[in-house]
């Protein structure tokens, strides 16, 4: 996963994460619910990164942590997302699309191997040209 429950709390505050995850009304963060949202966010991110990077990314950049937190928060709001959460989600997806298309690069050590140069075949020239085949 690109982000942890602690990252969610750091970014959005414990009160909000309790409100978003506490489905049993226990008054505390439901870690399983939060981790599931973070796993889903990481899977969504991987969908964009797979075209340009070898997965899994073992040492993700802070950027991926922030994007994963925004995506997970949006998912946790289950259809009643605030305008701010929706905008942050849309911004995260737009950034992932830029990364996917190559408009934005991430300096990762896990890039896929470079494609080999295309094969080139050379010959010694034509044995039979138009002049040699005249009259046949």
Predicted regions span which residues?
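Ordered, amphipathic secondary-structure segments that act as subunit-interaction surfaces
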Residues: 47, 51, 63-82
């Amino acid at each position: 996963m690109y982000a942890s429950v602690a990252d969610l709390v750091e970014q959005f505050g414990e009160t909000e994460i309790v409100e978003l995850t506490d489905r049993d009304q226990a008054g505390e963060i439901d870690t399983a619910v939060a981790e599931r949202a973070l796993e889903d966010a990481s899977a969504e991110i991987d969908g964009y990164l797979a075209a340009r990077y070898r997965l899994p990314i073992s040492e993700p950049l802070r950027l991926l942590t922030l994007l994963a937190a925004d995506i997970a928060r949006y998912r946790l709001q289950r259809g009643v997302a605030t305008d701010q959460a929706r905008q942050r989600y849309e911004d995260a997806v737009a950034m992932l699309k830029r990364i996917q298309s190559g408009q934005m690069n991430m300096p990762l050590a896990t890039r896929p191997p470079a494609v080999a140069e295309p094969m080139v075949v050379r010959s010694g020239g034509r044995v039979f040209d138009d002049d040699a085949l005249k009259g046949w």
